[in-house]
Structures are given as C-alpha cells and as structure tokens.
Amino acid sequence: MPLTDQAKIQIVQERVFIKKVCRNCGALNSIRATKCRRCHSTNLRPKKKELPTKRA
C-alpha cells in the first residue's frame, strides 16, 4: 500500500534515510555520530537517499 500523504512520506524518509552507515561493519548509526556504535570506527558514510529499483 503506497503512501500518498506528503506528511507521512516526510516522516518515513527521515526515519529511513537520515542515517550513517559504517564502512567497516555495516552498522546503522545516527546522523550525528562521529564513531560507529558497534566497532568504534570513524569511517562512516551517509546512507544512500534512493530506493533501489526493482528489476523485471
């Protein structure tokens, strides 16, 4: 069931996409994190903002 309400879409995007991902262990961290919560590495990247496209 796709979302049509713009307010709900905004909430979902904030919860899903505004994260940082550790390049060493793959753990999700908060956007304000400077070190990984799992392996304590400082090698973090922002999570990709696009959903993967489905292949036919």
From Swiss-Prot:
GO biological process: translation
UniProtKB keywords: Ribonucleoprotein, Ribosomal protein
Tagged with keyword Hydrolase: no
Keyword Nucleus: no
GO function terms (MF aspect): structural constituent of ribosome
SUPFAM superfamilies on file: Zn-binding ribosomal proteins
Family according to the record: Belongs to the eukaryotic ribosomal protein eL40 family.
Protein name stated in the entry: Large ribosomal subunit protein eL40
